[in-house]
C-alpha cells in the first residue's frame, strides 16, 4: 500500500509536443503573411494610370456637339421668293429636300430613329445603326498626299529661302513670342516620319441644331498613328540677364518625337452664314473663318489699292470697294477630348557636366504640347477651313501628255485668255522668290497650255502659319485664299 503511494505519476509527453507544434505553426504563419505582404504590396505592379478616355467619356457623351449651340440667327433666312424679281427664275428648294432625314434617305444611309427632345438644353447625338465604314480608300489618298509633302520637303531642303528648315527657324525665333531669356533657337534635326495615319470606323451621326432644319450631320472617324521617326530636335541657350545681360549661359538641347497618336476626328460642314463661334472668357477670342476672310480681303484690297496708286490711277482707294458677298462653305474639324498623344522627350542640359533626360523638362515640354493641341483642335474648339471653288474653269484646265485626245481637247484660246494667262504668269514670276512653290512630285508634270495653271501651295516663312492655298482665275487675280491649320507650337492660325 505504501509502495503504491510513493510511486510518482508519469508525465505525458504529448503536452510538450503539442506546444512545439503550435509554436512552429504560429511562426510559419507569420512568415507566410510577411512574405505575402512583401510580394503583393511592396513588389507588386502599380495599377495602370486612369485613361484619358475614361476620365472624359462621360463628358464626351454629355458634351454639346453643335458648334452653333450658343449663337442664334439675327434674322430669319430669306427664301428665293423674297429676292428681287431678276432671281425668281430659280425655283425654290423645299426644306423637306434639304433636311437631315431627306439626305440620309436619298443616299441610302440607315435612317436615324426619332429621339425625344434633349434635357437641360443639351444637344442629343443620334447614332445611326448603319455599318461603320473601313475607309481603306481614304487611307490610300491621305498616304499619297503625305508622301508627296515629304518628298517635296526633301527636294527643297537646299533652297536658300523656302526650305522647311528656314521656315521652322523663322517660326521658332519669332521675337513677338520668344521670351527674352531664350537665345536663338536652332533646328538641328527634322524627321517627317515614315508611317501614315490610319482612319477607320467612320460613322455618320446627327446632332440637334436649332439653326438648321432636321439637325446637322457629323462624320466621326477613328485615327491612329504610330511613328517613331516623326521628330524634331532643337538647340538653344538659356540666358541669365541679371545683374547684367548675358551674365550666365546654359546650353539646352531638346528632341521631341511623336510616339503614338490616336483619337476620334469629328468633321462637319459649316455654312458661311453661321455666326462666329464662342470662346471661353479667360482666353482671347481667336479669329473665326469669317474674320480671317474679311481681314484677308481687306489686305488684298489694300494691296490692289497701293498698286493702283503706284500706277497713277485716278480710282478711289480700294478699301472703299464693297466686299465680296458670295457665300462659301467651310469644313470644321476637331478631335474629341478622349485623344491619346504619347511623346518622347530627350534633353541635354549643360556644357561640361551635362544632365541628360531630365524628367521635369520632359513633363514641361509634354504639358506645353498638350496645351497647344487642346487650344486649337480639341472640342469645343474647332478648326474651320474654307472649301475651294470646284466649278470647272478654263484657267485651271490642263491636258495630260501622252493621251490620244490631246489634239481634240485643245480648243483655240481667245486673245483675252492668252493675255490673262500672261498676266498670271507675270505675277507668279514676281512672287517666286518670296514663297515656296510646290511643283512636281512624281517626275515631270504635263506641260499646260498658255491659259491653264494649277493651284499652288505657298509656305510663308515669316510666321507660323502653315501652307496657304492660293488660286488664280483666268483673269490673273488672286481669289478664294484660305489657310490650313498650323502644326507647330505658337502658331498664329485662325482658331475657333
UniProtKB/Swiss-Prot annotation:
Residues 304-314 have a biased composition (Low complexity). Residues 65-74, 85-96, 407-418 have a biased composition (Polar residues). Its main location: endoplasmic reticulum. InterPro entries: Mmm1 (IPR027537), MMM1_dom (IPR019411), SMP_LBD (IPR031468). Residues 50-96, 276-331, 396-434, 459-496 are annotated as: Disordered. It is a single-pass type I membrane protein. Residues 131-388 form the SMP-LTD domain. The chain crosses the membrane at residues 23-43. Residues 54-64 have a biased composition (Basic residues). Residues 276-287 have a biased composition (Pro residues). The SMP-LTD domain is a barrel-like domain that can bind various types of glycerophospholipids in its interior and mediate their transfer between two adjacent bilayers. Belongs to the MMM1 family. Component of the ERMES/MDM complex, which serves as a molecular tether to connect the endoplasmic reticulum (ER) and mitochondria. Components of this complex are involved in the control of mitochondrial shape and protein biogenesis, and function in nonvesicular lipid trafficking between the ER and mitochondria. The mdm12-mmm1 subcomplex functions in the major beta-barrel assembly pathway that is responsible for biogenesis of all outer membrane beta-barrel proteins, and acts in a late step after the SAM complex. This is Maintenance of mitochondrial morphology protein 1. It comes from Aspergillus fumigatus (strain ATCC MYA-4609 / CBS 101355 / FGSC A1100 / Af293) (Neosartorya fumigata).
